[in-house]
Amino acid sequence: CRVQVSVGAPVPPVDPDPDHHHPPVDTSWHLQLQGTPRLDVAARLYELDLFDTSSQTIAALHAQQRRLLCYFSAGSQEEWRADAGSFPSSVQGEPLADWPGEVWLDIRDSKVRELMRKRLQLARDKGCDGVDPDNVDGYLQNSGFALSAADQLDYNRFLAREAHGMGLAIALKNDLQQITSLVDSFDLAINEQCHAFQECHYLAPFIQAGKPVLNIEYADRFMADEQSQQQLCDEA
């Protein structure tokens, strides 16, 4: 199912930019960040890992008239990534809870922005239609840096400007408290667990703007029990 907030009839975005993809508000979505990508899922929008997905896989999806979001972390350094050694120690902060080998980044630093620009260029060069930059709410976390809400807004808008400048759509991942300030800069929202935490109402501005909201719920019952899954879809 497509899990999204219902707030009445959506309206089309005003003057959509024809230079990058604009997923429709009712798009279907397949997310897979590990393992050999399945290319047989009947979804209009796929999401795969930026680093682990080949240009050949992306071309195969395009041949099936699929669109692709490429996932990467924009707010953390993951020690297993090919460019991990390019992040100076001065921009590496506290570890992410429950994610070994991953630390928060100082998003105010020009070197971090330079490296994220290169990741966006990689997405463009591989043929991704858009990107899903994760961990863009570090100002709310124990990052090891004195990040402010203004720092986060500036960084997230930087990511959106750079992505659009390269012809890429861009999703806002979580960062619920800044949605009203960022909805005009992003093409869709991707959220984790808004039903579990009763936070889905924060996402209404995207639906009102005619932009999709894609939701992930991690509770085992939604994967193992079809009735629970259907109930979740009905509530959404």
Summary of predicted features, one role per range:
Residues 1-20:
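Bacterial Sec-dependent N-terminal signal peptides
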Residues 15-236:
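Glycan-processing catalytic domains of CAZymes
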